[in-house]
Regions:
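N-terminal beta-strand/alpha-helix entry module and adjacent surface
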Residues: 6, 11, 23-124, 128-244
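Ala/Thr-enriched low-complexity intrinsically disordered regions
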Residues: 2, 12-18, 28
Length: 244
């Protein structure tokens, strides 16, 4: 199958080989068409569920000296300017740019969405940089985000804001410890929100209080990502029992 040519090369890097990613059907579940979207990408409001938020941040806390990433699952709403982020999947904490594990994980996540809930799909990407003071969106994040945006044009990238996370205990903020990036009219990734445009909000105002409780109890130890699942397939990458 020409669609998968080159995928077996375990040293291929997504930073240089984004065209080798197979074509997934993300957007067929979610149902956003670019022609209906116009140039309002930076005006979209992303409502982030507590479960999705906690899994992403706890994954980064489990690997504080590594960059980590994840996939954002969600759906459109009756309001075309609002995207609901329902869940998230922790991906990797090592070799984030290797194609074969990324390919496997995306296929499994897509199948999971189809089985779990109608209308649920892969709609965005999460990234946490290695250094807490690094708030720049790197090439790997942009390229994976680009790939998802090919099939879901309103796809956001959520970047962990290490400084906000570090100060959370002191300031008790109710805002997410994340920076939102969306594509502008020229299809370049741009930080949103500073100009009153798009924003990401927590759908449950108490989410940061719950996050602080999870940090105090070291809940991050229980988070499973795809790196761990690929090493031991008995480990649940969906983390379905994490908050039971």
């Amino acid at each position: 199958n020409a669609e998968y040519m080159g995928i077996s090369n375990s040293f291929a890097k997504i930073t240089h080989q984004t065209h080798l990613l197979p074509v997934y059907r993300f957007s067929t579940n979610v149902g956003v068409e670019e022609k209906a979207m116009g140039d309002d990408r930076l005006g979209v409001r992303y409502e982030l569920s507590q479960k999705a938020y906690l899994k992403l941040v706890l994954h980064s806390l489990k690997h504080p000296y590594s960059e980590v990433n994840g996939i954002i699952l969600g759906r459109t709403t009756s309001d075309p300017s609002v995207i609901s982020i329902v869940d998230s999947v922790p991906l990797f904490h090592s070799n984030l740019a290797l194609l074969p594990p990324l390919e496997i994980s995306l296929l499994m996540i897509e199948e999971h969405c189809a089985n779990v809930e109608e209308g649920l799909g892969i709609i965005g990407y999460f990234h946490a940089n290695e250094r807490i003071d690094d708030s720049e969106l790197g090439m790997v994040a942009k390229n994976i985000g680009d790939h998802i945006a090919r099939y879901f044009p309103l796809a956001p990238i959520l970047l962990l804001d290490g400084k906000k996370l570090d100060s959370l205990k002191r300031d008790k903020s109710i805002a997410p410890v994340l920076k939102l990036y969306a594509k502008d009219a020229y299809k370049n990734w741009k930080a949103a929100g500073s100009d009153g445009g798009g924003k990401v909000v927590l759908s449950q105002p108490a989410a940061n209080s719950i996050l602080l409780d999870c940090m105090a109890t070291e809940k991050w130890r229980e988070v499973v990502d795809f790196d761990e699942h690929l090493d031991d397939i008995t480990k649940d990458w969906s983390n379905s029992g994490l908050f039971n």
